[in-house]
Amino acid sequence: MKEYSSDKIRNVAVVSHDGTGKTALVESLLLTSGAVDFVGKGQDNKHIMDFEPEEIKRNVTIQLGMAPCEWHDHKVNFIDTPGYNEFHGEVRAALRACDGMLMVLSSTSGVETDTVRAWDYAVELQMPRMAFINKMDVDGADFFGTIERMRELFGKGIMPLQIPIGEGADFEGVVDVAKMTAFTYKDGQPTEVAVPAHLIEKAQEIREMTVEAAAEGSDELLEKYLEGEELSLEEIRQGLREGMISGRVCPIMCGSATSRIGLDQVLDRMIRYMPDATKKVMTATDAETGEQCVVHVDKPLTAFVFKTLLDPFAGKQSFVRIFSGELKEGDRLFDVNQGVEEKWGKMVTLIGKQQIPVSAAKAGDIVVIPKLANAKTGDTLTAPDFKVTYDAIRFPQPLYTVAMEPVKKGEEEKLASAVLKVAEEDPTCVVVKNAEARQLQIDCMGEVHLEHILNKMDRKYGVQAKLVTPYIPYRETIKGSAETESKYKKQSGGHGQYGHVKIQVDPLYDGSEFAFVDKIFGGAVPKQYIPAVEKGAKETLDKGLIAGYPMIGVQVTLLDGSYHSVDSSELAFKVATSQAIKDVIPKAKPVLLEPIYEVNVFAPDAFMGDIMGDLNSRRGRVLGMEQSERTGISVVKAQVPLAEMSDYVTALRSITQGQGVFNRQFYTYEEVPHKQAEEIIAAHKTQE
């Protein structure tokens, strides 16, 4: 594959809801372009793009895949993405690397949840969008119904460039409304024909919409249109391109990936309407000054690692988008985030898992660099004399928390290492570092994602894990005040031990976890032993007095005490204080606290009642409901105990038929109800 200049490169993220035929479309586009000489069939589990064992087993895309093709002296880099929502992090990574998005919709299913989710993220990134309505040859295909629904959700910028000739078993081609000509297909090859008579009126109606949208692309075209002059085909295309790049217009095409109908026109329109890399202007941060700067394609080399793959045998592969300059074999490469110069030997491009050597790549291209020792997903790679960083990818928040331990005893370190390697590949698998829990916890996207993680650790790193109950960081506190005194005295011949303290405990109401007050007068307890008293109190409270959880919100006041000139020591006062704390806390109305989270649930209005009922069943407090920015979507705001959220990802998906999402953040600690507290305390006692 030859080297292409920046203006001849198109980077396209292909996204959809699961089951629309997205991967089949990518592979058929590769076949149409001549990049491959065969395509797999999903039912045979032989996709070029889905080659990981888990993908073959499930017949779904799990991780993003790369595939370039050449078409009319241009290079198109396709990034195929997973459709299942638990792997949406891969979609976000792909969109950061690309300049345009191709949405794939099924003509029978229409607009589905994850299509909307991808659209919203592309809008957030101000990314041009194009759509392909697939499966027009399937029974129940409804092109115009899908267009109508898209307009309801995404606005009047949804602009069909084609209409189908027939639907279902009668589907045989497409009408190009701008040219007012038609194409029928046999074995993927087009034949230009006249527009069928029964479609002329509809095609002219849509053409008028298209011309009007194109005219709004510039003042010059709009003036010409309003004066009643006819726009030329080139002017229509120019206006549509400007409209798409601005995000005002989303061109719509249709066809069939499996029958290869309309695919040549998809490639034509990608080149015609998708922005090239010269249009990409990036904002970066100067690594030395911290100031924002603008990076054009003609600046020195900058590149961004948007995906990392690890293989126990082949090593690391870093997927890299070049935003400026040029990368050639032998060039120096600096990882600004890690602060090191990377040693590297070669770069390749991929079609599925097939590697194709690349000697040089210009701004706008996407390559894979093997065996970068330090680079991680989200890192910026630059020329050594032009150190800037790009913002990291904003991945979805993983909210499904699990704890695990190895099936085989003694493999704890092996399991921890495997989890960290999986997390390096997949930023939506987050290892929770919590020394208090004394267990390995991860946050992931859901049950399917978790199963994929467990299978990958077994297959790649030879370690099996079993799930255990995740640790909930309960806390203990007191609601009352109490006093006590304790004397630690030990004499066994020779030097003994003596420490005597009188203390008071009180609840703190300012949010502090611990406070120590010294009220000793007249040297009843010498000053050199006061720190030991404080340490003894703090360490004992940290171990917990009710159920083994740290006790917070407690003020300990040293009121009085006594000492022995020979036998007293720091240890003696520390032990005496510990005994006093254990004695006084039960008198101070101790209670158990649990973490409460603020939760925002986004879902269609029709599910609001069921969502609020479910939150109430989880001991949640529903604070209110309001409309979101998207029509028909509401937001429920609630406060919910963390202990009741372990299965909420799965439950919400079930309640809303996959259309609900939520986020959460820690809010406060509150007292655990009596019944639940008794259960927690009883469980602790059985483990002692």
Model-assigned labels for residue ranges:
Residues M1-E688:
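Structural and coupling elements of P-loop NTPases
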